[in-house]
């Protein structure tokens, strides 16, 4: 059923896809939801409703790791959020980050966390080798759901999450700490050669310089430790019909252009990612791809389950992804943004349109010597 798309074979979500491995030897040569599966975000994520408030800003020292308290903006702590076009955004380096951070956005991020677990056919949280009592760092942790789940699963581990927006819950495990606002694109020192795994999820659209970020990540990992990155390529693909002229295709082109103009492109290129990881010094790079159908048109039950989750995630994402880029970069009014968002959602719900996106998972190791 899956033919060759623009970037190669589209891999079904229900299968464990083959891996593209790049080893060192080769280097020389709305709150209202209609989907009954997800009516209660706290039920689907298996956690209690958190108090949505910033966590404390305690200093921490462990295995030589310095305090990160100096990166906090005093002005943003006094006025951490501001409203724009009916959505709330964090005020740290106001206007730079394109995504909101209100309750609707926090629910969206938690839905994606669940989606990734379903799509990868595993309840694992980390797929690269790691010690059970290790030090784990989550860059751009969002609501902190991944960090909290890791801390609960590995009570002897030490888990840190950092993010621009202070939206993490205060009722987190004792072995888990959060620091926000924290800009991981600015210079940071959190203990070089000290982390057993660094995790980054959905960074596209937020990062200006991937090569510099990968070099910082490389420096902070222990020798032999791993970096894991999860990204979605939002470019719509379809194997049985062209998408030209459809709103979903036009919307992506607008979003791609706006985020490129803002110098934080949301478009994802796996070849560039692998090249940047290699140039940063990583070896044993593993690349997996998983297909994400936009609606449950497929007959396979697992594929349909993935599609239901992704349909919910996309329906929550279209306006969130569009509002700031289209209003700030293109000066569109709200009516125009909402109109194209509604058209995209309608096509995403249409089972006659067999469109999909691609989930990319990377694992890369810092050499042991």
From Swiss-Prot:
Description of what induces expression: Expression is regulated by the developmental regulators flbB and flbE.
Biased composition (Low complexity): 20-37
Molecular-function annotations in GO: methyltransferase activity
Protein's name according to its UniProt entry: Secondary metabolism regulator laeA
Organism: Aspergillus flavus (strain ATCC 200026 / FGSC A1120 / IAM 13836 / NRRL 3357 / JCM 12722 / SRRC 167)
Sorted UniProt keywords: Methyltransferase, Nucleus, S-adenosyl-L-methionine, Sporulation, Transcription, Transcription regulation, Transferase, Virulence
Keyword Lipoprotein: no
Chemical reaction(s) catalysed: L-methionyl-[protein] + S-adenosyl-L-methionine = S-methyl-L-methionyl-[protein] + S-adenosyl-L-homocysteine
EC assignment: 2.1.1.-
UniProt region (Disordered), positions on chain: 1-37
Keyword flag S-adenosyl-L-methionine: yes
Entry function: Methyltransferase that performs automethylation. No other methyl-accepting substrate has been identified yet. Component of the velvet transcription factor complex that acts as a global regulator for secondary metabolite gene expression. Required for aflR expression and subsequent aflatoxin production. Negatively regulates veA expression. Controls conidiophore and conidial development. Required for hydrophobin production which plays a role in cell surface hydrophobicity and host defense escape.
Outcome of gene disruption: Leads to decreased conidial production, loss of sclerotia, and altered in host colonization. Reduces expression of hydrophobins rodA and rodB, resulting in a decrease of colony hydrophobicity. Impairs expression of aflR. Abolishes production of aflatoxin. Leads to down-regulation of nitrate metabolic genes. Prevents metabolization of host cell lipid reserves and is inhibited by oleic acid in growth assays.
CC terms in the record's Gene Ontology section: nucleus
Record CDD domains: AdoMet_MTases
Annotated family: Belongs to the methyltransferase superfamily. LaeA methyltransferase family.
Localization terms from the record: Nucleus
GO biological process: methylation; sporulation resulting in formation of a cellular spore
A Pfam family assignment: Methyltransf_23
Subunit: Component of the heterotrimeric velvet complex composed of laeA, veA and velB; VeA acting as a bridging protein between laeA and velB. Interacts directly with veA.
């Amino acid at each position: 059923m899956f033919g060759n798309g623009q970037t190669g074979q589209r891999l079904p979500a229900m299968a464990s896809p083959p891996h593209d491995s790049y080893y060192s030897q080769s280097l020389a040569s709305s709150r209202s939801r209609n989907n009954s599966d997800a009516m209660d975000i706290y039920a689907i994520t298996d956690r209690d409703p958190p108090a949505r408030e910033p966590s404390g800003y305690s200093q921490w020292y462990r295995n030589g790791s310095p305090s990160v308290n100096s990166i906090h903006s005093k002005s943003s702590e006094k006025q951490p959020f501001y409203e724009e076009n009916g959505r709330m955004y964090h005020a740290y380096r106001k206007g730079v980050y394109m995504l909101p951070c209100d309750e609707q956005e926090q629910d969206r991020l938690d839905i994606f966390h669940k989606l990734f677990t379903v799509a990868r056919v595993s309840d694992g949280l980390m797929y690269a080798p790691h010690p059970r009592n290790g030090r784990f760092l989550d860059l751009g942790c969002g609501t902190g759901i991944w960090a909290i789940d890791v801390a609960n699963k590995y009570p002897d581990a030490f888990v840190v999450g950092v993010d621009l927006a202070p939206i993490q819950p205060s009722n987190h495990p004792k072995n888990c700490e959060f620091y926000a606002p924290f800009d991981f694109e600015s210079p940071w020192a959190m203990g070089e050669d000290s982390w057993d795994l660094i995790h980054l999820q959905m960074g596209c659209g937020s990062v200006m310089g991937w090569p510099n970020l990968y070099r910082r990540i490389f420096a902070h990992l222990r020798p032999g430790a791993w970096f894991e990155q999860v990204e979605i390529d939002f470019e719509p693909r379809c194997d049985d019909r062209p998408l030209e002229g459809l709103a979903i295709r036009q919307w992506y082109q607008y979003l791609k252009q706006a985020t490129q103009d803002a110098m934080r492109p949301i478009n994802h290129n796996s070849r560039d990612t692998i090249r940047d990881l290699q140039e940063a010094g990583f070896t044993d790079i593993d690349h997996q791809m998983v297909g994400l159908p936009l609606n449950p048109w497929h007959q396979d039950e697992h594929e349909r389950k993935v599609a239901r989750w992704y349909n919910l995630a996309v329906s929550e994402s279209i306006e969130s992804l569009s509002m700031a880029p289209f209003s700030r970069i293109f000066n569109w009014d709200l009516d125009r943004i909402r109109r194209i968002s509604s058209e995209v959602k309608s096509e995403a719900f249409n089972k006659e349109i067999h469109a999909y996106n691609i989930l990319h998972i990377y694992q890369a190791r810092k050499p042991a010597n």
